[in-house]
Amino acid sequence: MVSDRRLLKKFGKIADKIIALEPQMRQLKDEDFILKTQEFKQMLENGKSLDDILIEVYAVAREAARRVLGLNAYKMQLIGGIILNSGDIAEMRTGEGKTLTGIFPAYLNALSGKGVHIVTVNEYLSRRDSEINGKVFDLLGISVGLNGSSLTKTEKREAYNKDITYTTNAELGFDYLRDNMVSDYSLKVQRKLNYCIIDEADSVLIDEARTPLIISGGTSTRINLYKAANNFALTLKEHDDLDIDLESKQVYLNEQGMKKANEFFSLKNLFAIENTEIFHLIMNALKAQFAFKEGVEYTVRDNEILLIDQFTGRIMHGRSYSDGLQQALQAKENVDIEEETVTLATITYQNFYRLYSKIAGMTGTAKTEEEEFIKIYNTRVIQTPTNKPVIRKDEPDLTFGTKNAALKKLVEDVLEAHKKGAPILIGTTSVESSEQIARYLKKANLKFETINAKNHDREAEIVAKAGEIGAITLATNMAGRGTDIKLAKGVAELGGLRVFGVERNEARRIDNQLRGRSGRQGDPGLSRFYISMDDDLMMRFTAPKTRQRFKALGDDYIKSKMFTRAVTNAQKKLEGMNFDQRKNVLDYDNILAQQREIIYAQRDDILEANDLSVVIEKMQITAAYELIEKHSTLVHGEKTINKKELLEVIDGILVPKNKFRIDDFNNKEKMDLAVEIAEAMMQLYKARISDIPDDVIIVMERKIILDAFDKHWTKHLDIAGKLKSGIYLQQYAQNNPLAIYIEQATNLFNKMKINIANEVVENLANVILRVVEDEEQREERIEVTDKDIEEILFETGLQPSDINNKAINQRFDELEEEFKDDKQKLRRLRIQRDVMLGLVLELERRAEMIISPQNDQQAITQLIKELQNDIDIASITIDQIHQNFNNMVEQINDPEKLKHLVIAKDVLLQLVARMDDIKEQEKQTRKKKKKKPHEDESSKTKIG
């Protein structure tokens, strides 16, 4: 691999050539920049590569930035831009102008028209950078979009269709997952993933890599089980019942713990397959009780569990743990237990960013993680020299026996620096630590600003003022990244910004980020860490005897470069463990990634296809083969097809009636027979859809196939997740857990594809039949007139007095039996039956329309029956209704019932009037013509 020095020398020569074009670029008029952009695009169309035009493109962008922002990029920023275009990580110190550096590769790659994504860690930075740099891109004739969580799908699509899109890493990943859940291709918002520039690349690609992106949906709650698992966890004791690995923060039941679990839940064997759910709940309860701390991984606010970003200290609103861990934490903290979520779609950041054709990133600290960048993302980390030498003083750590002693010394040093007026930034690793330090500062009557998970709304504003005289800022971890701390006038003379770190972080890189807040662009500064044996890192990596010796120091401390190196070595060990953990996440996700790519690619094909017959045909072959397997029995060690059973389940249902005989199944290989059955399936399917418009069919097919894909993919993710959570137990059987997982996940995936095929074939058969029936019913509802009713009565021999459900069904049953061999006549009879039954329904609806919703409908219906006095609706006269009404009125004293009776009379009179109209039409028809009316095409259209 080429060394950084050689690369920087090579890129430095290119940067010199860019700077040499400055006099020429100064001659450009403002309107010339758009013309240059058009010229560059034409050069690419004519076969030039991005590298071929890089020098002139960067020179034009440099001049545009100078005119718009008043910033003339210096050589190191141009070198950073060249590194980014090469698809690598540029390590640039704080204050070295990363925002300006990103303009050059973004402009160059936007010329291809394939889109550029500039990724930030929060929406504030996305908005800020898009507004500032957007003015430069506007002069260049390049469109800029801003993506955010509050945008509609249309707004997101517009943002992604711009030449350059600013977005947060989380929103970018969630948009990708949501795009692969849409039911119509036009609903997608993203284009193909081409090129992205990631700001704070270490935060996105390393720190957040352990947490996958998950889109969840609701499922049933199991509140009592969560509480039971939590109560069980409370009965356990460390060492006696549990093995807790402090280094990896993993919690396991030991042999005694397993015995207790069996007793508590009345189980014979906790690890039996039927107890998978219980085991999963127990493991989550153990994590919640013993591995997660309030104020570190999460906080409780307003009866709700809120997740804390471990690397910035910010609350992650809208985010929750999946697979029941959120509910386990809710049970632990005794807050309302929410509905458990099931994973609908998921991807790790590692596998998401590997979908891009090219990725690049900028950060102040990444060299310590270069091995991971190379192995996971195939990107190098190239350190760019600072524009001015770093003169900040990094002092050795002060190591104490107790946290109390460390914080006392911290307050002394803060008071001393504050008396001089020097600004101070105190960095902590958690909200809990931040609040503890705040109490010490308040006790010393010091005024300070705080940024942590519970107070981050004014983050950028507080960080920007942290360089003012007398400012004291208490920040959780790397809150405020992306916002420079500029020294106020006179601060440099006071020694610059003091950075005091309380407790070392898990990674040297994060410590370096904290140090790097001081001493930007050649400013003076000082950094120092206060370490105690109570710190998490020390508890995990120092021997009890060592901790005891330090505690004997009291308030005294050790200031030793040797011990500082020992702490650094512990961090290196932890970095290796964290890398292994992230690599482990990736190894398990790789199998899902391959499966996800297959599913998403097939999904896209289905969304874009205008003809799905090939897809359906393949599924029919799969379904046919599975049917053959299902109806095969083991005879003398060989599976033999039960031919009679097989014929019964397919004949007339999945294949045309009498298409196969039992003899047709003789002497055939199962796959050959499956192909024959599938061909017959397609034959019947095409016959059933022959009368349905193509545009209706494609929509129906697409929906059925996508529904099956999504349903079974979701189920697969859930099963695979549960499989992974317990796979570590395989190591006790001397098996390789990853190898077992890959094998079982592959089998699950193959089974999932079979289930999809079976469901699609079955649902297509059922739904298409319903569509045919619905289409018939839709047609028969078109323009059904009194003349149509008249013709049906004449054809079928029905009388007006027969207009009730029982008489209609009885007569049509007789006619269908009579014409059972005449398919056309049968079709017409079915339509006529539905028309007549529809007429009865219409008469009933008319009655209901008159009855006000506020009235007692049941009472009125009973009164209508009494008014009819057991006389058929077709025979009763208006006079009889009035007579019955008068008789009933004399017997009613209740005003409410009298009102109901009046309504009932009106309803009945309307029904009788309708029947009289039908009778009159029948008489007129019989007078005109006694033979069957001519059945012309227009009547067929109206009725059928």
UniProtKB/Swiss-Prot annotation:
PANTHER family: CHLOROPLAST PROTEIN-TRANSPORTING ATPASE, SECA INNER MEMBRANE COMPONENT OF SEC PROTEIN SECRETION SYSTEM. It catalyses: ATP + H2O + cellular proteinSide 1 = ADP + phosphate + cellular proteinSide 2. Residues 920-944 are annotated as: Disordered. It is a peripheral membrane protein. Keywords: ATP-binding, Cell membrane, Cytoplasm, Membrane, Nucleotide-binding, Protein transport, Translocase, Translocation, Transport. SMART domains: SecA_DEAD, SecA_PP_bind. Residues 933-944 have a biased composition (Basic and acidic residues). ATP binds at residues 77, 95-99, 484. One of its GO terms (biological process) is protein targeting. Part of the Sec protein translocase complex. Interacts with the SecYEG preprotein conducting channel. Has a central role in coupling the hydrolysis of ATP to the transfer of proteins into and across the cell membrane, serving as an ATP-driven molecular motor driving the stepwise translocation of polypeptide chains across the membrane. Its EC number is 7.4.2.8. Belongs to the SecA family. GO terms for cellular component: cell envelope Sec protein transport complex; cytosol; plasma membrane. The gene is secA. Coiled coil: none annotated. One of its GO terms (molecular function) is ATP binding. Pfam families: P-loop_SecA, SecA_DEAD, SecA_PP_bind, SecA_SW. Its main location: membrane. Monomer and homodimer. Part of the essential Sec protein translocation apparatus which comprises SecA, SecYEG and auxiliary proteins SecDF. Other proteins may also be involved. It comes from the Bacteria. The keyword Ligase does not apply. InterPro entries: Helicase_ATP-bd (IPR014001), Helicase_C-like (IPR001650), P-loop_NTPase (IPR027417), SecA (IPR000185), SecA_DEAD (IPR011115), SecA_motor_DEAD (IPR014018), SecA_preprotein_X-link_dom (IPR011130), SecA_SF2_C (IPR044722). It is found in: Cell membrane; Cytoplasm. The keyword Transport applies. This is Protein translocase subunit SecA. CDD domains: DEXDc_SecA, SF2_C_secA. Transmembrane segments: none annotated.
